[in-house]
Amino acid sequence: MAQKSKAYRAAAEKIEAGKYYTPTEAVALAKETGSAKFNSTVEVALKLGVDPRKADQMVRGTVILPHGTGKTARVIVFATGPAAEAAIAAGADEVGGSDLIEKVAGGYTDFDSAVSTPELMGQVGRLGKVLGPRGLMPNPKTGTVTPDVAKAVFDIKGGKIEFRVDKHANVHFVVGKAGFTADQLNDNIKVALDEVVRLKPSAAKGRYIQKGAVSTTFGPGIPLDVNAI
């Protein structure tokens, strides 16, 4: 633990007090401060000027990162018949109908994303207590409730990420690994930030993106210049 603390302090010392970095500058610093022992995950966190308690100010979306996340997502699909066959062919990690629903109801959550055909959502809906708190419940708004389950699997495994504002008006998402090139990380961050900006609720007043930071696993947050977003 002491070694981690020492590494954290060493990384934090490279961040200038009171300075706000452009996304490009933050990426360069994140790569420099990321752990050399393993390929750290790079994340972006934003504080939005919205009231998540109001339905017309909810920010939720998906975006396909051009260079992926650096991790192959585990995807399960609730489907039967031809749709199940298509999901298997697309590379889904587990596919099933009532059997898979029962497995998840029993507490199985060893996956990163869940997809369902519309026909099975009546049964999948009862998994809300298991999937809801983990952000894994299939939803038409994020393309995870669809008759074209194969495309959903392709997209998710190809680098599609989901994000949604939490009750404190924060949103965070993975944009890659510290081992990515700076150009790859910059491309991913730009695409993700552009989508967050595009989804600004019309009911939101004042500054939309109030604060932001880029960080690596166990690393300090590098404050973003929100005027550069």
Swiss-Prot record:
InterPro entries, sorted: Ribosom_uL1_bac-type (IPR005878), Ribosomal_uL1 (IPR002143), Ribosomal_uL1-like (IPR023674), Ribosomal_uL1/biogenesis (IPR028364), Ribosomal_uL1_3-a/b-sand (IPR016095), Ribosomal_uL1_CS (IPR023673)
UniProt-listed Gene3D superfamilies: 3.30.190.20, 3.40.50.790
Pfam families, per the entry: Ribosomal_L1
Keyword hit for Transcription: no
GO annotations of cellular component type: large ribosomal subunit
Cytoplasm as UniProt keyword: no
Molecular function as annotated in GO: rRNA binding; structural constituent of ribosome; tRNA binding
Any one Gene Ontology BP term: regulation of translation
This protein's UniProt keywords: Repressor, Ribonucleoprotein, Ribosomal protein, RNA-binding, rRNA-binding, Translation regulation, tRNA-binding
Family the entry assigns: Belongs to the universal ribosomal protein uL1 family.
Oligomeric and partner information: Part of the 50S ribosomal subunit.
Function, as annotated: Binds directly to 23S rRNA. The L1 stalk is quite mobile in the ribosome, and is involved in E site tRNA release.
HAMAP family: Ribosomal_uL1_B
Protein known as: Large ribosomal subunit protein uL1
Species of the source: Leifsonia xyli subsp. xyli (strain CTCB07)
UniProt gene name: rplA
